[in-house]
């Protein structure tokens, strides 16, 4: 049953990544705010924690991040004559960097929490 839950987390990670990539060019209220980068951080942290809980292992937090990075890089790169969803602007780069950093950060925190190397880890022993 946990693999079904984990597969659902991966599907949601795919959908969230596509939505955030289309938000990269958004201009809310006429201003160039990096809304997609904020959504990427919040989405990757929450999906990483959900992946670790669904798989019941700290390594489960890596899957949603890898799916997100794969989708974001695919939509950011274009071939000759094709469209690019993530623009090559500051907001597009902020989306890619913030999302990848959040995905890596949640993996580091969940694995460190399992190994007891966090500041609170010695209290759990």
Q: Residue locations for each model-derived region?
A:
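Alpha-helical transmembrane segments and their cytosolic membrane-interface
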Residues: 1-18
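Structural motif marking the loop-to-transmembrane transition
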Residues: 3-7, 31-35, 39, 58-59
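Central hydrophobic cores of alpha-helical transmembrane segments
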Residues: 59-72
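Membrane-water interface at the C-terminal end of transmembrane alpha helices
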Residues: 5, 99-125
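Hydrophobic alpha-helical transmembrane segments
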Residues: 39-44, 97-101
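Membrane interfacial helix motifs at helix-loop boundaries and amphipathic/re-entrant anchors
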Residues: 16-38, 72-96
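Canonical alpha-helical transmembrane segments
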Residues: 42-56
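Membrane-interfacial segments
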Residues: 23, 27-31, 55, 59, ...
């Amino acid at each position: 049953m946990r693999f079904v839950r984990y597969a659902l987390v991966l599907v949601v990670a795919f959908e969230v990544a596509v939505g955030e990539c289309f938000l990269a060019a958004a201009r809310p209220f006429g201003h160039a705010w990096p809304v997609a980068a904020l959504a990427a951080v919040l989405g990757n942290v929450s999906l990483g924690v959900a992946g670790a809980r669904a798989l019941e292992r700290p390594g489960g937090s890596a899957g949603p991040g890898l799916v997100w990075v794969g989708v974001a890089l695919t939509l950011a790169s274009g071939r000759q004559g094709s469209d690019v969803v993530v623009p090559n602007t500051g907001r597009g780069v902020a989306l890619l960097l913030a999302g990848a950093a959040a995905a890596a950060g949640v993996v580091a925190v969940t694995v460190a929490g399992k190994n007891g190397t966090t500041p609170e880890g010695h209290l759990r022993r």
